[in-house]
């Protein structure tokens, strides 16, 4: 296993090279000081991006079909909070290109980039923003309602 840490002005890149696995995980983590209101938006962003569609893949079905054509590549988003920081994570799980076509690696990274940088936006909003916001509010209410029943 080879480990390399590259520190730049605005980011730190961690590279771990190993040939023990048949899948490759690539992650992007953006971290900043915790802010309650911004964290709510980060949480919504992590929930909206995978289902929203993009300029080139208009529906979640289009995204799913493309990911399946890339040997069921997985793309995941989440928001995390610690006492002082909050972060947004995007990760990609792909089959090691040595077992597939060489172009698959580049196509998978392009798909992650497409979802992050080209979301489908109409009237200055994500397609599923209101639905996702209401689902999140209901989840929070359910946690509060069920907390005392445990």
Labelled PLM ranges:
Residues 55, 99-100, 124, 143:
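A general boundary/transition motif marking the beginning of the first structured unit of a protein
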Residues 3, 143-144:
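A generic local secondary-structure boundary/capping motif
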Residues 50-57:
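Catalytic Zn2+-binding segment of zinc metalloproteases
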Residues 16, 22-42, 60-114, 145-150:
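M16 family metallopeptidases and their MPP-like homologs
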Residues 1-25:
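N- or domain-start disorder-to-order transition segments that initiate the globular core
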Residues 26-37, 55, 130-142:
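Short N-terminal helix-initiation segments at or just after the protein's N-terminus
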Residues 45:
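Active-site His/Glu-centered metal-binding helix of metallohydrolases
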Residues 60, 64, 115-141:
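Acidic/histidine-enriched alpha-helical segments
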């Amino acid at each position: 296993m080879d480990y390399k840490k590259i520190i730049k002005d605005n980011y730190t890149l961690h590279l771990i090279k190993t040939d023990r696995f048949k899948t490759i995980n690539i992650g992007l983590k953006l971290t900043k000081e915790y802010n309650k209101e911004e964290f709510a938006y980060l949480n919504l962003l992590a929930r909206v991006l995978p289902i929203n569609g993009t300029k080139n893949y208009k529906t979640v079905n289009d995204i799913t079909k493309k990911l399946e054509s890339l040997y069921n590549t997985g793309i995941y988003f989440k928001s995390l909070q610690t006492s002082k920081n909050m972060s947004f994570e995007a990760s990609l799980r792909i089959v090691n290109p040595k077992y597939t076509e060489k172009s698959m690696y580049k196509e998978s990274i392009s798909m992650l980039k497409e979802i992050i940088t080209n979301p489908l936006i109409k009237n200055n909003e994500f397609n599923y923003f209101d639905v996702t916001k209401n689902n999140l509010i209901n989840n929070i209410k359910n946690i509060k309602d069920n907390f005392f029943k445990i």
